[in-house]
């Protein structure tokens, strides 16, 4: 087994780390370095804005809030997923509705999504697992109805 020789920084990484650690960072998603990342990322993707987050759970909250999911709404999520998907839905005041997954992929089953839709359905949350993608063509057809 090879001995661990420490981090191998090639550019300005150490300087950037020192800058962050020497500021009033306080573990929040703000600060000069964060703002620089958001601006550069937005430009790379030809967008006006980009928003960083500290976790996937935070991004789920942002997405649900951006789509106006709230009290009394239902969000269809896969029956096999991380708990945070359901937690994010609950925190918005909505109700997670679990759709079955396909036996061959363990991904959300578009046929079961159709069965779960009610007048209260506000969103469908897909989760891509194990290097596999959900059938987004079929899910989007359902979502657009």
Go through the PLM ranges and name each one.
Residues 1-66, 70, 91-92, 126, ...:
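Conserved PLP-binding active-site segment in aminotransferase class I/II-type PLP enzymes
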Residues 15, 61, 86-87, 134-137:
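Alpha-helical elements of the RecA-like P-loop NTPase motor core of helicases
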Residues 21, 73, 117-118:
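Short, flexible helix/strand-to-coil boundary loops that buttress conserved ligand/catalytic motifs
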Residues 30, 78, 132:
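Charged, low-complexity surface patches
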Residues 34-35, 82, 136:
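Generic non-transmembrane alpha-helix signal with a bias for helix starts/N-cap capping motifs
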Residues 45-47, 53-67, 71, 76-111, ...:
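Substrate-binding/gating loop at the entrance of the active-site cleft, primarily
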Residues 104-145:
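Active-site phosphate-binding strand-loop segment of PLP-dependent enzymes
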